[in-house]
Amino acid sequence: EKLAALNEAKRVTKPGGYILVAYIMNEYSVITYAIKEKHIKEGIEGGMLDESFHCTEKANDLYSFVRLEDIEALNAQAALTREKIIAADGAANYIRPFLNALDEEEFDMFVQYHLSTCERADLMGASAHTVDILRVCGDSE
């Protein structure tokens, strides 16, 4: 389904145009739901997580969880060029109660921190969401 959606987006986008794709990241789900909320055993026993802790289709009927390598494979299969990928929320979901307690100036500093780290590959996979900014190559590109 993901590849079909990317190919359809590519079909209706002009050459040189952009496609923005939002993803829910696998590791965020494992850390928050499976480990933090103590569903790890049932997740493994129920086949919701594979041996590498990748969420399977059984994990959720509504959402699909991906890793960076899944995103890169989809882009390659769809022959789309990445301009940039960013962590939409980074650490925010992990520290939400602390963020809610910040004053306005402190929160602005957190936003500055997030903007300075949202493209770091070493932090990307742990974000709850990513946005992949892709370009449709034209005939001359």
Predicted regions and their residues:
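Conserved class I S-adenosyl-L-methionine
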Residues: Y18-M48
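C-terminal alpha-helical "lid/dimerization" subdomain adjacent to the S-adenosyl-L-methionine
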Residues: I40-Y63
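Short catalytic/ligand-binding loop motif for oxyanion handling, primarily in non-cytosolic enzymes
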Residues: E1, Y28-T32, A91-I95
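A short glycine-rich, Lys/Arg-flanked "PGG" loop and its adjoining helix->strand segment in the class I
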Residues: L3-Y18
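Short alpha-helix
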Residues: N60-A79, I85
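Short, glycine/charged-enriched secondary-structure capping and boundary segments
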Residues: L3-A5, A34-E37, N100
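A structural signal for short, well-ordered beta-strand segments and their strand-loop junctions
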Residues: L20-Y23, T81-A87
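A C-terminal cap/extension of S-adenosyl-L-methionine-dependent methyltransferases
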Residues: K84-E141
